[in-house]
Regions:
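Intrinsically disordered, charged and Pro/Gly-enriched terminal/linker segments
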Residues: 2-149
Length: 149
């Protein structure tokens, strides 16, 4: 249509971006953590598309998604839904690989599920990413993080 793309959105058509936006428009996920995990656990939206035209589009979605994920993480942690917390934290790491709050909740949740070795692995992966990004060591020890939330 005049040199532009046009996609007709019908009931048979599923778009994870639109489903995610719909959840975000509710202002929170309304307890739809499982649906949100299913969408964002695949990684960044349009990650394989390297076109500057989409950069602000992707950035805006991530900016809206991050606080919603943090709220869901906190809510699920209070409900002791630790597996969901870990999955949400992993999803948040796609957006912000050095999100300190997500690390704390992931470590706490894994520890509460008696998965201390997995928690240590998570901490080490985070520390490496932090060093690569910030060019300095992560300032908190594993023990500090276990006590932080």
């Amino acid at each position: 249509d005049k040199g532009l793309f046009r996609i007709e959105y019908t009931d048979e058509f599923y778009c994870d971006y639109l489903a995610c936006v719909k959840l975000l428009m509710i202002n929170n996920t309304g307890g739809n953590a499982t649906e949100l995990i299913g969408i964002v656990s695949r990684g960044k939206f349009l990650r394989s598309i390297d076109m500057p035209e989409f950069d602000s589009f992707k950035g805006n979605l991530e900016q809206k998604l991050e606080p919603v994920l943090l709220i869901e993480i906190e809510n699920c942690f209070k409900k002791e839904a630790y597996k969901i917390v870990v999955a949400l934290c992993e999803s948040l790491f796609y957006i912000d690989p050095i999100n300190d709050e997500a690390l704390c909740y992931a470590i706490q949740s894994l520890t509460k599920m008696n998965m201390v070795n997995e928690a240590k692995v998570q901490y080490l992966k985070f520390s490496v990413e932090y060093m690569n990004t910030m060019n300095t060591e992560y300032p908190y020890s594993f023990t500090d993080i276990q006590k932080k939330v």
